[in-house]
Regions:
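Conserved catalytic submotifs in the C-terminal HATPase_c
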Residues: 46, 80-83, 106-116, 123, ...
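Short alpha-helical segment of the dimerization/phosphotransfer core of two-component systems
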Residues: 54-59
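A conserved beta-strand-to-alpha-helix junction within the catalytic ATP-binding
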Residues: 80-95, 126
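Glycine-rich/acidic phosphate-handling loop/turn and adjacent ATP-lid/helix
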Residues: 159-193
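Short alpha-helical Gxxx[C/S/T] motif in the catalytic ATP-binding
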Residues: 195, 199
Length: 231
């Protein structure tokens, strides 16, 4: 992707550089005012300023995501390489996931009772998979269950660790796609920032793949595969 012949990573780097300072300045002044360094505030003023501060925090997080995406596109990110249990990571992420509780949407983990060892950057893969879980819970409109199903595909070369995330009806098709060339991933969605584009690039940097459910509702589920650890 490029704009007017300028490489996409450079565009991202320039945007981050231009945005970071004003966001930091505005956030700093808002917090000075909230601490009443310029005088006392009414309840109404405090409420408005707190809302503005939350918005600045979100913009700051988006700027950080832009920086990370640009670095991934430029291959400037050094990934850690260590063996870890992917199944245990899935259980850990699910236990801390609270999105959807207020709408009676719950998360059910399956297939994580046995270790599934992979090699890679546990911190970055944790963020990527956590973002996929959060997106699945956030985008489900009705009460129900989102399933996270872990499995190992050992008859392929290379053998894969597979994680499918979605409604019950989508899981089989998501898992079946792991053994061949999987369909594309729908990463550009409003309201989720850049965590999904970042997640896809992190997974692919580990030699894996990420894809969406096929058909009329590609956002109904997603799945990923990572090479199983060889030692």
């Amino acid at each position: 992707m490029s704009g007017e012949g300028i490489p996409f990573p450079r565009v991202m780097s320039l945007a981050v550089h231009e945005l970071r300072t004003p966001v930091t300045v505005v956030t700093g002044y808002l917090r000075m005012v909230l601490r009443e360094q310029a005088g006392p505030l009414t309840d109404k003023q405090r409420k408005m300023l707190e809302e503005a501060d939350r918005s600045c925090v979100r913009i700051g997080a988006l700027v950080a995501e832009m920086s990370e995406l640009g670095r991934l596109e430029s291959n400037e990110v050094a990934l850690a390489r260590a063996n870890f249990d992917l199944a245990a990571l899935i259980v850990e992420l699910a236990s801390g996931m609270h999105e959807g509780h207020d709408r009676d949407v719950r998360l059910d983990v399956r297939g994580a009772n046995q270790p599934i060892m992979v090699t890679g950057d546990r911190v970055r893969l944790s963020a990527a998979i956590g973002a996929l879980m959060h997106a699945a819970l956030r985008e489900r409109g009705d009460p129900g269950t989102i399933v996270v199903e872990c499995s190992a595909l050992t008859h392929t070369t290379p053998p894969w660790a597979v994680v499918a995330i979605g409604d019950e009806p989508t899981l089989k098709a998501l898992g079946d796609a792991a053994g061949a060339t999987p369909p594309p991933f729908d990463e550009w969605r409003g309201g989720l920032g850049l965590v999904l584009p970042i997640g896809r690039r992190v997974i692919e940097a580990h030699g894996g793949a990420l894809w969406s459910a096929v058909g009329d509702a590609p956002r109904a589920g997603s799945a990923l595969r990572l090479p199983l650890a060889t030692s």
